[in-house]
Amino acid sequence: MACQICDDTGWKAVETNGVRRVVRCDCKREEHARRLFEDARIPPRYRNCNFDNFQVYPNEKLTNAAAKVRKFAERFPDVQRGFCLIGPHGVGKTHLAVATLRAALARGNQGLFYEVSDLLRVIRNTYNPVTKTAEMDVLQPLLTAQLLVLDDVGKEKTSEWVEETMTFIVNSRYNQRLVTIFTSNYEDTPDIDVLDSLRVRVGSRMYSRMHEMCDFIEYGGADYRLLPPNGGVDDLMALWKVAGEQKSKLPTRAKNQLRAQMKPAKELGWSGGKHGT
């Protein structure tokens, strides 16, 4: 059925202070927004994530994080830096990142979402001789999107290829002044003795670039994935308490062993990235 306003021409006449002019019809704006949303690769599980359905509770760091991210979303694209959400599993990092992306898409900005492990799998598939997709077919949208969300950074097992590929993407966006959002479960510390730190997981070059590009926002809290159906604030507070108790009981022996194993590499000058960098 044709649009009753523009008859599917995409344009409509408006009059302001006696002056008639032609502007884009709302139907075309809606169609454009739908197309942007479909091309953004947001996984079905997260497609309905927004700021209004992000459930907060008396957790100062979490509420501050949500407020900062929402302010960023309201200002985009008039921003200079992205952000990196750091925290344990299930505290809503992906929800907040997608809520920001959806807000940008709704205002006509081009955006893209990739879980890093999935992105690397897609790129690897282009090396298969029977695959018709070229590597740059995958990379080009990442290098040009107005807003890119890279979810779960550091999850992929570290290798020279992984580090080179991710550093190329991040560095290219940095040079083009394009905004990137990251999420990660790994601790933000410059200490290369901590093997499960973000710096060691992604390599020193990418870690340094991320800090140049982004504001780091770190918080903890309840695991939303454990929230029962129709659970509320009291349930979240209880889950948060349990999470805090479990964290306080974690043994330090394993961590000390890892530090001891890392010491020889540190003495040889390994920075956490490739050998010799």
Model-based region annotation:
Residues 1-64, 227-277:
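A short, basic N-terminal segment
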Residues 55-83:
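Pre-Walker A (pre-P-loop) alpha-helix and adjacent loop at the N terminus of AAA/AAA+ ATPase modules
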Residues 57-66, 105-144, 160:
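Short glycine-rich substrate-engagement loop in P-loop NTPases that contacts/grips substrate
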Residues 79-97:
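Walker A/P-loop nucleotide-binding motif
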Residues 95-109:
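P-loop NTPase Walker A phosphate-binding motif
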Residues 109-110, 144-147, 176-182:
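Loop/turn-to-beta-strand initiation segments
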